[in-house]
């Protein structure tokens, strides 16, 4: 590809030896390396961040949520949920959490249970929402915030908008957060209240993509606010 575009092959170099001692030496070469973008598991990323002397563009997991507000169009919410969770599960912009206002839980979650059963999605849900799912795992508080990268999702039924924002602040990864609501002011409030690179109103989390947003190529998995929209 480089030769096709008249670029030198030396622009891309592979270090064939995975020895961590060599990686440590590489991370200290401030005179020769401008920036490191680690790609791999959380342990590797933590190691590079803690030990590098070269600037690091850090990326972590994508724990994205859909919040279904009391004023949501539930058909729209279902479309956002299924697209965000089941279209492609192993990506950083897939949904890992669903937060539902208690006012619409009785109408929405039985339909979610039926759809997820058909799609084979495993549900982890808090006590308040467990009545709507047969055989669902009742989740403990410390189990929220998991990046499943598969057909699993964590669900929480909340009392109000503020509780939803608090949940996202505690368990989100600042990647992408979505609200489904027909209340325009509530959508704007959500965008101001939630801290994430991309905050969406009535759109799928799967649109959080460098190409889709016109921000250029992606680097790593989730480079926090390097790409913010």
Residue ranges: model-predicted function:
Residues 1-71:
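Rossmann-like NAD(P) dinucleotide-binding subdomain of oxidoreductase/dehydrogenase enzymes
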Residues 10-13, 34-35, 54-57, 65-66, ...:
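Structural motif
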Residues 16, 125-127, 159:
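Short loop/edge segments at beta-strand edges and connector loops
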Residues 22, 29-32, 40-44, 59, ...:
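General structural feature for long, well-ordered alpha-helical segments within catalytic domains
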Residues 27-31, 73, 136-143, 214-218:
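Short, surface-exposed amphipathic charged segments that create phosphate/polyanion-binding patches used
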Residues 44-150, 201:
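ALDH superfamily catalytic-core signature
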Residues 140-229:
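Conserved C-terminal structural/oligomerization subdomain of aldehyde/semialdehyde dehydrogenase
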């Amino acid at each position: 590809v480089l030769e096709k575009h008249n670029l030198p092959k030396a622009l891309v170099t592979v270090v064939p030896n995975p020895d961590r001692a060599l990686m440590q030496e590489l991370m200290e070469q401030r005179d020769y390396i401008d920036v490191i973008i680690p790609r791999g598991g959380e342990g590797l990323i933590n190691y590079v961040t803690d030990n590098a002397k070269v600037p690091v563009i850090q990326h972590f997991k994508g724990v994205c949520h859909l919040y279904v507000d009391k004023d949501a169009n539930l058909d729209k919410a279902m479309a956002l949920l299924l697209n965000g969770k089941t279209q492609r599960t192993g990506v950083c912009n897939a949904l890992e959490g669903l937060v539902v206002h208690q006012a619409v839980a009785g109408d929405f979650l039985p339909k979610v249970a039926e759809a997820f059963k058909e799609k084979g999605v495993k549900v982890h849900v808090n006590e308040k929402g467990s009545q709507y799912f047969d055989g669902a795992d009742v989740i403990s508080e410390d189990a929220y915030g998991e990046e499943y990268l598969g057909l699993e999702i964590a669900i929480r039924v909340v009392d109000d908008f503020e509780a939803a924002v608090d949940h996202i602040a505690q368990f989100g990864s600042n990647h992408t957060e979505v609200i489904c609501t027909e209340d325009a002011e509530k959508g704007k409030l959500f965008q101001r209240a939630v801290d994430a690179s991309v905050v969406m109103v009535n759109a799928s989390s799967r649109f959080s993509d460098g190409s889709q947003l016109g921000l250029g190529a992606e680097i790593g998995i989730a480079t926090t606010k390097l790409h913010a929209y």
